[in-house]
Design a protein with these regions (language model features):
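Flexible assembly/topogenesis modules
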Residues: 1-217
């Protein structure tokens, strides 16, 4: 299989929805009552990187888990928008005759990482295996090849109905994620972008036909 460069054009999109219809009495009761729902939100920090660095985490609210992905410019240049490894997915049109045995292995862009809160290390330096394999298995029983690194503050982050732990970033003055990268894949000649996601809890209030969040940023 070969790759070809070119823009990705969305020809058509659709949205699938589920509707719940209420009868007149139920609709009146629902409209006149106040409601509070525990919801989850997603916060995102994106930063360009060219080597080892410390990235400030500007999040708010009780966060149940952090997830981050690194993406090199080399894969973006061939429009592999969902490739977060250090190797293009597809083979080039022309190949040299002296290929190495590991030519098409997909290495990780992350080497090591640690999390720091208010000047105190929440974690020691761990290599990517800890955040990729151990945290994925402990939190989600997941070993898919997605190149997403995770750190969970919750015992069961997959449980959407019952929180089991979080870190209130609104009470943290300084939080940072320090990373060491695979220098063969991320450097000044081949920079990358790190995408950091935080899943947090909030409360959605609905009253008198109006909705809003209980806790603002």
């Amino acid at each position: 299989m070969v790759y070809t460069e070119g823009d990705i054009n969305l020809v058509n999109t659709c949205l699938t929805c589920n509707y719940i219809y209420l009868d007149t009495k139920e609709r009146k009761k629902f409209a006149q009552s106040s409601h509070e729902y525990l919801i989850q939100q997603l916060q995102i920090n994106n930063y360009p990187i060219q080597g080892n660095t410390s990235i400030p985490l500007t999040f708010n609210h009780p966060v149940k888990e952090l997830m981050w992905l690194l993406q090199s410019d080399s894969v973006l240049q061939v429009n592999e928008l969902l490739n977060f490894s250090g190797q293009k997915k597809y083979i080039a049109n022309s190949l040299p005759s002296n290929l190495k045995y590991n030519q098409f292995l997909r290495p990780h862009l992350l080497d090591k990482a640690k999390l720091t809160l208010n000047g105190q290390d929440r974690t020691d330096w761990h290599d990517y295996n800890y955040f990729y394999y151990v945290q994925n298995y402990e939190s989600f029983r997941n070993c898919a090849e997605h190149f997403a690194y995770i750190y969970s503050f919750s015992l069961n982050p997959w449980n959407l109905l019952q929180p089991s732990g979080s870190l209130n970033f609104s009470r943290i003055d300084n939080a940072s994620l320090s990373i060491k990268v695979n220098k063969d894949k991320v450097n000044t000649l081949n920079p990358a972008i790190i995408y950091i996601y935080a899943v947090n809890y909030n409360v959605l209030r609905i009253q008198s036909g109006m909705g809003g969040l209980k806790f603002a940023n």
